[in-house]
């Protein structure tokens, strides 16, 4: 209900939107114009034609890609109010099988390029300290900037596990202040050089691509593209704040951003021939256009905005990974909910992996100029993949002409940006492309390895408990076998037809049968209510086979052993199962017996046992099993670390391979059994 209220257009919703959605795109003015000066070589090379044309490129890039493609079109492609490339893929995946590769490439690139966003944003903000005479140490000792950035980011990553709801309440007002201030300073500087308003004409945007002052040629678009890298995050965060609030706030955000870019351009026009600036190679007009008396306050505000942008990126990464897990693109991970809001999650493994890579990038590149040279390459891939999926969605809605126009129009535009960004490869873009490739391969191996395994693997065939009910009852009362456990528990997904994986009954009945007083098959359902804790029981017409549907809220601890003990106690009190008296124990009398939890793992040793399996399938399935075995065990997910847990290795294939390679030649000295004979 609270999320629904936030998604409706309201002042509170719009304020939250400013803090959640626009962190990345809103802090781009910190480094975009700086990157364009670096492309020119020195400020004196930034001629009026170069500056006006560059700002014009920024204006029209934000207009076409962010406003038209994402705000006006993409936000309408919501999946139950959720946005982002994986949510979009879920809408169109039935249209063509190859679309999965589009989604995997886009998602992998978005995750990979996200490691650079906190690094470049916070570094650009902190580098403003170099321009303060009272803090000359930052200019004298270059390592102070990455050290300061490291401390800020390390603290930011450390507080993630505690939840950011309290801090998050200040994000909206802080970003409102940020956009207002940068817009005002931009407007002040525009008044010093009104000629910069020519940038609204697309003619200057086209001319600068061929202007001699532009030494980069078309590759200048690699720096211009940095202004719109946050557009994909804008779409991904739709589920947190709602389309209506983004529609209402984007005109304000867009206006202040353009005012600031125009203001920076105006400052460059009025200072590019000044003796104090003309030979400068690393000038950031964002800080330079602020009066000296206000620079400290601006640096503090910029750092706060950079932290907010980084926070939004981190939580966005959690959401993206959570969606990938739901689509079976990635292995299951331990996900925590620090607050009562369902969408606010924390994934420790992703948090610290992101922290490690981001800090590594900070120390590898050390300056924002070096980071800018590497930033944006992978995200162009994501935008291109989103365009492909978006055209499929529009076509699905019956607008074929519009779908083709979007595919070829934005596809061509983003292909040009991708081509222009290829120069970033040798300047560090190889790092994000390498990360993209690694993440992509992991998702391919997990998803397709699972699908290929299901093709060969009869261990995952669903079979009904009802068909084996009599065997389980007989096994439970078979005095010829020792009791394996009083309560034998399998964490199994049981459907409404009482079907479970074949491997579970294979574990109980085959090999060495496991005799137990009661067999438990528990299905754990996570609900949207934070503290939900309920269960339902199906005894299957017996007294020793129990199906449990355990419903736990997303904030409820998943200590299954404690819940199960309560369920057993209640069933004994209801006379649904027999008391489980124990002869020994420090607490007597005790009606609840012992528990044995069985967790099944697969190994790759028997991959060679199926002669019909191709080498590529063998590689995919083996990789999938290896990934499964290095991720947390279900015993950890369900709080069974101190319980009696049997980690059982099961074969990939429970049906023997039909490879008729043996021929029986003869049997010597066989002994025929005698009727009624008692001979050994």
Swiss-Prot record:
Name listed for the protein in its UniProt record: Probable potassium transport system protein Kup 2
Its biological purpose: Transport of potassium into the cell. Likely operates as a K(+):H(+) symporter.
InterPro entries recorded: K+_transporter, K_trans_C, K_trans_N, Kup
Reactions that this protein is recorded to catalyse: K(+)(in) + H(+)(in) = K(+)(out) + H(+)(out)
Topology relative to the membrane: Multi-pass membrane protein
One Pfam family this sequence matches: K_trans_C
GO molecular function, one term: symporter activity
Phylogenetic lineage: Bacteria, Bacillati, Bacillota, Bacilli, Lactobacillales
Alphabetic keyword roster: Cell membrane, Ion transport, Membrane, Potassium, Potassium transport, Symport, Transmembrane, Transmembrane helix, Transport
Main location: membrane
Compartment annotation: Cell membrane
Keyword Membrane in record: yes
Gene name linked to the record: kup2
Keyword set includes Transmembrane: yes
Membrane-crossing residue ranges in chain numbering: 12-32, 55-75, 98-118, 143-163, 170-190, 216-236, 249-269, 288-308, 345-365, 374-394, 402-422, 428-448
CC terms in the record's Gene Ontology section: plasma membrane
């Amino acid at each position: 209900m609270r999320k629904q209220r936030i998604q409706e257009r309201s002042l509170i919703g719009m304020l939250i939107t400013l803090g959640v959605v626009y962190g990345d795109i809103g802090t781009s003015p910190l480094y975009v114009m700086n990157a364009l000066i670096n492309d020119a070589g020195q400020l004196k090379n930034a001629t009026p034609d170069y500056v006006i044309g560059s700002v014009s490129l920024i204006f029209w890039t934000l207009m076409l890609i962010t406003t038209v493609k994402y705000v006006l079109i993409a936000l309408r492609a919501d999946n139950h109010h959720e946005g982002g490339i994986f949510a979009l893929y879920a809408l169109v995946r039935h249209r063509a099988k190859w679309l999965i590769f589009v989604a995997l490439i886009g998602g992998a690139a978005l995750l990979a390029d996200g490691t650079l966003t906190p690094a470049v944003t916070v570094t650009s903000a902190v580098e403003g300290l170099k321009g303060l005479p009272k803090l000359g140490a930052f200019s004298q000792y270059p390592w102070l900037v990455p050290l300061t950035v490291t401390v800020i980011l390390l603290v930011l990553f450390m507080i993630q596990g505690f939840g950011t709801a309290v801090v998050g309440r200040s994000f909206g007002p802080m970003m409102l202040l940020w956009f207002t201030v940068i817009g005002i300073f931009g407007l002040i500087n525009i008044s010093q050089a009104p000629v910069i308003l020519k940038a609204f004409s697309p003619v200057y945007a086209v001319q600068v691509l061929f202007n001699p002052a532009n030494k980069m040629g078309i590759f200048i678009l690699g720096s211009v593209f940095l202004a719109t890298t946050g557009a994909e995050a804008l779409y991904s965060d739709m589920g947190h704040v709602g389309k209506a609030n983004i529609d209402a706030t984007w005109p304000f955000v867009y206006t202040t951003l353009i005012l600031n870019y125009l203001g920076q351009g105006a400052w460059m026009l009025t200072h590019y021939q000044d003796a104090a600036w003309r030979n400068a190679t690393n000038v950031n007009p964002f800080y330079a256009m602020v009066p000296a008396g206000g620079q400290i306050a601006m640096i503090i505000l910029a750092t706060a905005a950079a932290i907010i942008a980084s926070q939004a990126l981190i939580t966005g990464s959690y959401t993206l990974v959570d969606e990938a897990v739901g689509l079976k693109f990635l292995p299951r991970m331990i996900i925590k909910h620090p607050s009562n809001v369902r969408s606010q999650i924390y994934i420790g493994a992703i948090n610290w992996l992101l922290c490690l890579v981001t800090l590594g990038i900070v120390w590898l590149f050390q300056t924002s100029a070096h980071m800018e040279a590497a930033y944006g390459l992978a995200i162009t891939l994501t935008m291109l993949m989103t365009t492909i999926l978006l055209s499929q969605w529009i076509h699905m809605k019956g607008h074929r002409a519009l779908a083709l126009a979007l595919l070829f129009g934005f596809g061509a535009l983003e292909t040009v940006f991708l081509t222009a960004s290829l120069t970033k490869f040798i300047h560090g873009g190889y790092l994000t492309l390498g990360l993209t490739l690694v993440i992509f391969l992991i998702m391919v191996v997990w998803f397709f390895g699972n699908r290929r395994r299901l093709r060969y693997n009869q261990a995952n065939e669903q079979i009904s408990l009802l068909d084996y009910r009599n065997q389980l009852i007989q096994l439970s009362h078979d005095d010829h076998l020792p009791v394996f456990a009083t309560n034998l528990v399998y964490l199994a997904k049981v459907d409404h037809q009482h079907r479970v994986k074949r491997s579970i009954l294979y574990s109980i009945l085959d090999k060495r049968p496991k005799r137990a007083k009661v067999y438990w098959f528990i299905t754990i359902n996570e609900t949207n209510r934070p503290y939900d804790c309920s269960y339902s029981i199906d005894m299957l017409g017996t007294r020793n086979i129990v199906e449990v549907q355990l419903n736990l809220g997303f904030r409820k601890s998943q200590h299954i052993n404690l819940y199960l003990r309560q369920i057993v106690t209640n069933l004994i009190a209801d006379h649904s199962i027999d008391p489980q008296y124990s002869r020994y124990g420090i607490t007597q009398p005790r009606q609840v017996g012992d528990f044995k939890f069985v967790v099944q793992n697969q190994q790759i040793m028997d991959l060679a046992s199926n002669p019909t399996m191709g080498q590529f399938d063998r590689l995919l399935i083996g990789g999938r099993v290896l990934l499964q075995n290095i991720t947390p065990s279900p015993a950890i997910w369900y709080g069974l670390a101190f319980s009696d847990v049997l980690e059982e290795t099961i074969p990939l294939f429970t049906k023997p391979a039909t490879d008729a390679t043996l021929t029986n030649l003869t049997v010597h000295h066989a002994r025929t059994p005698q009727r009624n004979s008692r001979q050994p």
